[in-house]
Amino acid sequence: MFRRLLIATVVGILAAFAVAGFRHAMLLLEWLFLNNDSGSLVNAATNLSPWRRLLTPALGGLAAGLLLMGWQKFTQQRPHAPTDYMEALQTDGQFDYAASLVKSLASLLVVTSGSAIGREGAMILLAALAASCFAQRFTPRQEWKLWIACGAAAGMAAAYRAPLAGSLFIAEVLFGTMMLASLGPVIISAVVALLVSNLINHSDALLYSVQLSVTVQARDYALIISTGVLAGLCGPLLLTLMNACHREFVSLKLAPPWQLALGGLIVGLLSLFTPAVWGNGYSTVQSFLTAPPLLMIIAGIFLCKLFAVLASSGSGAPGGVFTPTLFIGLAIGMLYGRSLGLWFPDGEEITLLLGLTGMATLLAATTHAPIMSTLMICEMTGEYQLLPGLLIACVIASVISRTLHRDSIYRQHTAKHS
């Protein structure tokens, strides 16, 4: 047991450095090509001329597509093993390392150029790759899946500063591919990754800064639960739209570079209306949580961002949809809160409360992982007072969503690439 805890610690350290490496590579490329050192793609887009804002995501998608197609032609074969940590956990615990690194580099290109796709997916993949590489050298074959799971959880903890949610992500989303008894090493890896990540970044701040002064009362619990019902209905709709957009892009029968370029061009066109569509949505989420906008502003940004996410994910841009889903959930919750705020004197607090609820419940509705989703929002914002209400709402959202749409976003992703 001591040996496993020691290896889990090493995996956590490796994962933290993998995540930090990807993050610093992003910052470097943003500085080189976008003349932006703020770390915010929305700020970068705001400071660009309209024609650069239009073309940059398309050029990034084109470059990523050429890289992926060029690698496949160079090797003259498709990857001989999984390039995704979920697939690796469901098979024999092995990666095609070279193809996975090329995929991560392609993700770096599309993320840095403004596509509305999550950077955290590539971060978690790199963390799992580092764990797998270490495991294949120093551990028996039957443990390889465990250490990939530890690496993925640690990567998630370092990316989102949420070690418990990262651990439960493995238990809930990938349930059946590993035993719950193995959660000990997973949690150790996640916590170590967070601590090392804090040391690297010289900060232990929460991912999102929120000033929620409301004390949750009976009325608020009713609103939280009703938001869970709304998210349970919206989750399957979002998954269906993502699937439909992917099918439409495939039906165009474009070469991968042009398909990714088209997705980027759509994002560029939408960014002419609002630069908030650029990136994974982190900056926009923080601005909404700091000062919730008016109803029509939320609605406008929500629609543009939704189309940008659908275009990016539908075109096959390598990256995650975890953080974009958080923004969509926040916007849905805030739209609901703004509508209700017309009848309540504390409309601002209700909007903020239901925005946080929307983040958790839409995440639960798309991942079918209510406990992880609840802990994720609490850990990212520090608002643990919301935990009881969020847990109930997330369970309701997950049950409704699972009834209407059998597959979660991750099972849908795996089926699409199998």
UniProtKB/Swiss-Prot annotation:
Entry's localization field: Cell inner membrane
Annotated keywords: Cell inner membrane, Cell membrane, Chloride, Chloride channel, Ion channel, Ion transport, Membrane, Transmembrane, Transmembrane helix, Transport, Voltage-gated channel
Main localization (coarse): membrane
Any one cellular-component term (Gene Ontology): plasma membrane
Protein family membership: Belongs to the chloride channel (TC 2.A.49) family. ClcB subfamily.
Xref: NCBIfam families: PRK01610.1 (NF002437)
Name of the protein in question: Voltage-gated ClC-type chloride channel ClcB
Species per Swiss-Prot/TrEMBL record: Escherichia coli O17:K52:H18 (strain UMN026 / ExPEC)
